[in-house]
Amino acid sequence: SILNLCIISVDRYWAISRPFCYERKMTQRVALVMVGLAWTLSILISFIPVQLHWHRDKVGSRDGLDPPSNLANGTPWEEAGESDRSAENCDSSLNRTYAISSSLISFYIPVAIMIVTYTRIYRIAQVQIRRISSLERAAEHAQSCRSREACAPDSGLRASIKKETKVLKTLSVI
């Protein structure tokens, strides 16, 4: 589910942003709590409300909670042939509060968290690539100066851009 993907993104962010603290704090118990939280939220937002018919809009519904006695034109349900609830009829009237809270909790908030965490991971990766590239260029420059060649300006900018592009492609696939 998206909630599990959200937990994975948060876990990856913690592992990348604080690698030394991650080893101590991310125990098996914490991982189980995070996965349990995702499943609990999924059950609370979908299974229980559907089983208890909380997800249906009470106005004009035929779910047994608040059944209207007549149709809009005054015809009773039985006369209109609606009493048997055949599989051909699809009642899509949702309770507005349920629809909004369900979509927020099970989709929009997790997706927003995933976008934020993967954006931060990308920025951390960019900073690391720049640091590594500058160290590599400094080492190459020092080597070229030691061998008494002309100390040429760095040509590692292209390599740095290639590495950043590779990181962007990798994160976009994830």
UniProtKB/Swiss-Prot annotation:
Residues 64-88 are annotated as: Disordered. Gene3D superfamilies: Rhodopsin 7-helix transmembrane proteins (1.20.1070.10). InterPro entries: GPCR_Rhodpsn, GPCR_Rhodpsn_7TM. Residues 11-32, 120-169 are cytoplasmic. The keyword Transit peptide does not apply. It is found in: Cell membrane. GO terms for molecular function: dopamine neurotransmitter receptor activity, coupled via Gs; G protein-coupled receptor activity. It is a multi-pass membrane protein. One of its GO terms (cellular component) is plasma membrane. Residues 55-96 are extracellular. The keyword Transcription regulation does not apply. One of its GO terms (biological process) is adenylate cyclase-activating adrenergic receptor signaling pathway. Keywords: Cell membrane, G-protein coupled receptor, Glycoprotein, Membrane, Receptor, Transducer, Transmembrane, Transmembrane helix. The chain crosses the membrane at residues 1-10, 33-54, 97-119, 170-174. Glycans are attached at N95. It holds the Pfam family 7tm_1. Belongs to the G-protein coupled receptor 1 family. PANTHER family: ADRENERGIC RECEPTOR-RELATED G-PROTEIN COUPLED RECEPTOR (PTHR24248), D(1B) DOPAMINE RECEPTOR (PTHR24248:SF136). Dopamine receptor whose activity is mediated by G proteins which activate adenylyl cyclase. This is D(1B) dopamine receptor. It comes from Bos taurus.
